[in-house]
Amino acid sequence: MTGGDEPPVCGIVLAAGAGRRYGGPKALARDPDGTPWLTRAVRTLQSAGCSPVLVALGAAPDAADLLPADIADVVVVPVPEWADGLAATLHAALGAAASTDAESTVVVPVDVPGLPASAVRRVIAAAAPAGVDGLARATYGGDPGHPVLIGRSHWAEVAASVSGDRGAGAYLAAHAALAVPCDDLWSGADVDTP
């Protein structure tokens, strides 16, 4: 729950890929201080009020072992078809989200270790009035980025709209997702190289 009277929002961490450009699965990547990106992503979503947090793993299923024992309310979602691309990961994660009582989900890839919880909170707050029909994404300098919030009423359509390594961007654009400027909080940059 996001606290107070706000509707429940679950978090999704997309971490199933092989990380070809990175040189290995980003689910196994760590900050210079040794903090796993996976742990950072889960804690960021939890700090923003997301519960549960679903972690989609495929190429590196053992990455779940990197999560500290003190992190509660995390569900590992296996993605056996991870090699089919981002679409397989979104299908698995949104399918798992359907078993929660969440009205919406916040989606982040594991390769945005700099993402602050404040950006997640801002996107959640901006989309809250729409409830299950919410559709929003952070923007940085006018460019779309993460996090992305998808209301429950969109989950099936989003899952049907993605294929291969094509994510939900086209769906978000076609359905006029609310653009939430977050460039005052962070650069929006993902990490593609070690």
Located regions from the model:
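A residue-level structural signature of the nucleotidyltransferase/glycosyltransferase Rossmann-like core
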Residues: 112, 146-149, 188-189
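Short, glycine/charged-rich beta-strand-loop motifs at protein surfaces that mediate ligand recognition
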Residues: 111-113, 155-162
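Conserved nucleotide-sugar donor-binding
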Residues: 102, 143-157
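Short beta-strand-to-turn element immediately C-terminal to the catalytic PLP-Schiff-base lysine
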Residues: 29-31, 149-151, 191-192
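Conserved alpha/beta core of the MobA/IspD/sugar-nucleotide pyrophosphorylase nucleotidyltransferase superfamily
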Residues: 2-7, 160-194
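Nucleotide and nucleotide-moiety/phosphate-recognizing core
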Residues: 4-144, 176-182
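A short acidic, helix-capping loop that chelates divalent metal ions and anchors anionic groups
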Residues: 20-24, 157-158, 188
